Amino acid sequence: MSILPVIFLPIFFYSPFVQTFNVPECIDKGQYFASFMELENEPVILPCPQINTLSSGYNILDILWEKRGADNDRIIQIDNGSNMLILNPTQSDSGIYIYITTNETYCDMMSLNLTIVSVSESNIDLISYPQIVNERSTGKMVCPNINAFISSNVNTELYGADIDALEIRDLNNGHLELLP
């Protein structure tokens, strides 16, 4: 009688199950339509313009600010990342800033252009925010980024033609309402 070799073959093969998700590449939404020009040594706050549209329907887990081609050590994220602060900026802080918003399934980024000018070379026409309101109708003027710097005991100064003929009501949130 001969002995037959017995080979045991497993019925089940062990293979570790690893679930992987493909993280999508960030969608580049391009450059924001408004450029920011600020004075040297005055705090700068850059807003994340997409926060209002994204927060309505998306669960944003992370917001990251970067400066293209430079270290990010001068960037301070405020308001849960929806704004970026630079204290005492210099002209070397001028450049393209990128903010990246991500959640579990989505990633997009947009860039903002920041130019820091010295006080000696500044021109108020470049830094002012011209807005036109028809004097025959109620209008609302919005001063960009003013909420970050305004306090309740600050008087607002307005300059313009026939400004005395209008009633000005401060809505206490950085908005002024002009009534004929």
UniProtKB/Swiss-Prot annotation:
GO terms for molecular function: interleukin-1 binding; interleukin-1 receptor activity. The keyword Oxidoreductase does not apply. SUPFAM superfamilies: Immunoglobulin. It comes from the Viruses. Disulfide bonds: none annotated. The keyword Repeat applies. Keywords: Glycoprotein, Host-virus interaction, Immunoglobulin domain, Repeat, Secreted, Signal, Viral immunoevasion. Glycans are attached at residues 80, 103, 113. InterPro entries: Ig-like_dom_sf (IPR036179), Ig-like_fold (IPR013783), IL-1-bd (IPR004078), IL-1_rcpt_I/II-typ (IPR004074). One of its GO terms (biological process) is symbiont-mediated perturbation of host process. Its main location: secreted. Residues 1-20 form the signal peptide. GO terms for cellular component: extracellular region. It is found in: Secreted. Belongs to the interleukin-1 receptor family. May reduce the host inflammatory response by interacting with inteleukin-1 beta (Il1b) and thus decreasing the association between IL1B and its cellular receptor. Interacts with mouse Il1b. This is Interleukin-1-binding protein. The lineage of its organism: Viruses, Varidnaviria, Bamfordvirae, Nucleocytoviricota, Pokkesviricetes. The gene is OPG201.
